[in-house]
Regions:
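Conserved "right-hand" nucleotidyltransferase catalytic core of DNA-directed polymerases
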Residues: 1-27, 32-43, 49, 124-125, ...
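Active-site-proximal helix-loop-helix substrate-binding element of RNase H-like nuclease domains
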Residues: 32, 39-43, 49-67, 72-187, ...
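Metal-dependent catalytic core segments for phosphate chemistry
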Residues: 36-40, 370-402
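Short glycine-rich phosphate-binding loop at a beta-alpha junction
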Residues: 73-81, 365, 432, 530-532
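Cytochrome P450 catalytic domain signature, combining two hallmark sequence patches
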Residues: 94-96, 113, 265-267, 378-390, ...
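Conserved catalytic core of nucleic-acid polymerases
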Residues: 209, 260-264, 318-319, 324, ...
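Short, contiguous acidic/charged loop-to-helix segments that flank catalytic cores in large enzymes
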Residues: 306-313, 348, 363, 382-385, ...
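C-terminal structured "cap/appendage" subdomains that terminate the fold
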Residues: 518-567
Length: 607
């Protein structure tokens, strides 16, 4: 069965809204800063049949988009953030209306594990590319080998022969032809939601072009050349079980250690011990003697620093694809085959964030956003009241009778309540509560029951959400992001969907409004944002961004969601210069920088 089966018979109605519908594709290579250098553009209006085919010299002389761009016109482009970045490189305005078949195809299949990943590639990650999308809908597609060959030709050359130029332009046209065919198979049940997603892709293009400013000299000239020596230093210091041979981890030594200690250990489907970093981290909570190994592998020893270095250009910015709509809840998942997103790496590395001359770098984050979304969407008056009072973890402790009103915050009780606050929205089990709290199963059962009795309206609402989703065979975010519900969909996925997909709605709305208002977003990070501002406009920019974030939260949750400034870094400082000494990763940042700069490292000899 094709992914498009069951499409509405009114799927073409949205086309009546536009006088022209231009399908557009650009081909480009990248410069040293990972920014696009547009090579050519092909476009076709499906209404009039007009076509355009422009080479780079023609594009460089353009001062306006070469196709219609009014309120009654639309641009259709697959993974449109690439085309929109090309327009930024050319100094051209953005189209008024953007429709992206990449995103709309995800909406069509999101959660339907029967069609994606393909049956013969069930371990495949990511979203369907153009050729995959065509195949999903039972449409003919070119070979992947042809696409790879053309892509390599474009990326690996700076000048093209006349024959190559003709071949590239034909390939450019083929991409447009395929997009038109795919668009005809897709059902768009809400053009307003689709245009919202297109506006977010425009925001993605702007954010990907900015990137995160870093201390390039430190990362490129000091950290990278000394990386193996840094790894060796920490391995020699912290590898108390002698599991490494130089900088290489010897799996058999850990197997032998597990058996010698008699540790209970999870196995792979083939019966081998699981040795992933996350597995060792979880096991370290059971066997504390493993904590130093877990920390060593997570923070230094197994970190492939080259994937971070690959994102940093000569201009001192780290740029990594944001991969919008990559998760089932519509969130980004920034990465690439040879790149890693700096905020996804251990916190100590973020000490190298550094604004450019005359600028400040600011991190703004929401306060208990997921709690607020669930409180607002469920209409639970007690949850809403507790959110309005401040610290939701402590307010829950008071309401649940675990702390007296007016009592000073007890960190131990607050941390226990934090487990319930964070876990209950996705259906954390008593076993999960007991494991995290290091308490008995009876205590965990009582605490879970107390949570639901404390917020009964939310409890009933979450149950109704799950029931309705299973009946409808789908669930949607406040702004229309859809997840197909099948027999395989987990109940905790449905319980958590509103908080996570609602959070994605908030992030997308903030990104759209802020970038369209001229605020420079360096990167969205889950629920937080790193923004850049001139030093003399810092206070007004923070105030404006906070206002946008608060209002976006209100539009999604129904109640204002508070915003806090997490960090302010003013040039010429880096984040590591201003973070508090007890901030996560700060001690490690200072230690590594001191090692590198004071020559306390041993050279690594590779055999």
């Amino acid at each position: 069965m094709s992914a498009g089966s069951g499409a509405s018979t009114t799927k073409d109605d949205w086309r009546q809204r536009f006088q022209s519908i231009w399908h557009v594709d650009t081909e480009y290579r990248e410069d040293a800063n990972h920014l696009p250098i547009p090579i050519c553009l092909h476009a076709r209006d499906e209404v009039s049949g007009r076509t355009l085919s422009l080479w780079r010299d023609e594009l460089l002389t353009s001062t306006r988009l070469p196709f219609d761009n009014g309120p009654d016109d639309a641009m259709v482009a697959f993974a449109s953030n690439a085309e929109l970045q090309s327009f930024l490189s050319l100094g051209l305005p953005f189209p008024t209306n953007v429709l992206d078949p990449y995103v709309e195809n995800i909406v069509a299949i999101n959660g339907n594990t029967a069609v994606w990943p393909p049956a013969d590639e069930k371990k495949r990650k990511g979203r369907p590319g153009l050729l995959d999308a065509l195949k999903l809908h039972g449409l003919p597609a070119r070979s992947q080998e042809h696409k790879d060959r053309m892509r390599d030709m474009i990326l690996e050359n700076e000048d093209y022969t006349p024959e190559q130029r003709l071949e590239i332009q034909e390939y450019n046209k083929e991409d447009v032809d395929d997009t038109i065919v795919l668009g005809g198979a897709l059902s768009i049940d809400s053009i307003d939601h689709a245009l919202f997603r297109g506006r977010y892709m425009a925001a993605v293009a702007r954010m990907e072009r900015v990137g995160l400013p870093v201390d390039g000299e430190f990362f490129l000239d000091e950290l990278a050349p000394n990386w193996d020596a840094i790894r060796l230093h920490y391995i020699q210091r912290d590898d108390e079980f002698h599991l490494y041979d130089g900088v290489n981890f010897v799996e058999e030594r850990l197997w032998n250690l597990i058996e010698a200690k008699g540790w209970d250990w999870p196995l792979t489907p083939t019966g081998r011990y699981q040795l992933k970093i996350a597995t060792i981290g979880r096991q370290a909570t059971r066997y504390p003697e493993l904590k130093s190994l877990a920390r060593l592998r997570d923070q230094i020893a197994e970190l492939r620093i080259n994937k971070l270095i690959n994102t940093i250009g000569p201009d001192g910015f780290s740029r990594c694809p944001l991969l919008p709509y990559w998760t089932i809840t519509g969130r980004n998942q920034p990465s690439a085959k040879d790149k890693m997103f700096l905020p996804s790496l251990p916190k100590w590395l973020q000490g190298g964030l550094k604004p450019p001359l005359g600028m400040a770098l600011v991190e703004l984050d929401y306060v208990a956003e997921e709690f607020a979304i669930v409180a607002g969407r469920s209409g639970d008056p007690d949850m809403i009241a507790d959110y309005g009072k401040g610290d939701v973890h402590w307010q829950y402790a008071i309401r649940a009778g675990l702390a007296a009103p007016g009592a000073a915050v007890d960190d131990h009780i607050r941390d226990l309540c934090k487990i319930l606050v964070h876990g209950s929205n996705y259906g954390i089990t008593p076993y999960g509560i007991a494991a995290r709290a290091k308490k008995s199963l009876d205590w965990a059962r009582e605490m879970r029951a107390r949570w639901w009795s404390t917020y009964p309206v939310c409890h009933q609402w979450l149950g109704d959400v799950v029931t309705q989703a299973r009946f409808d065979e789908e669930i949607r975010s406040p702004f229309g992001w859809r997840l197909i519900v099948t027999a395989d969909t987990k109940t905790r996925t449905l319980m958590n969907f509103t908080a996570q997909a609602g959070g994605a709605d908030v992030m997308q709305l903030v990104s759209i409004v802020a970038t369209e208002c001229g605020i420079t977003i360096a990167a969205p990070v889950h629920d937080a944002f790193w923004i850049l501002a001139p030093l003399d406009e810092l206070d007004t920019t923070i105030a404006r961004m906070s206002e946008i974030m608060t209002e976006a939260g209100r539009l999604v949750a129904g109640i204002p969601i508070r915003v806090k400034v997490e960090a302010v870094v003013r040039w010429p400082q880096c984040l590591g210069d201003v973070r508090k000494p007890d901030a996560k990763g700060q001690a490690m940042w200072c230690e590594v920088r001191e090692l590198v700069r004071n020559g306390g490292l041993q050279k690594v000899v590779h055999g």
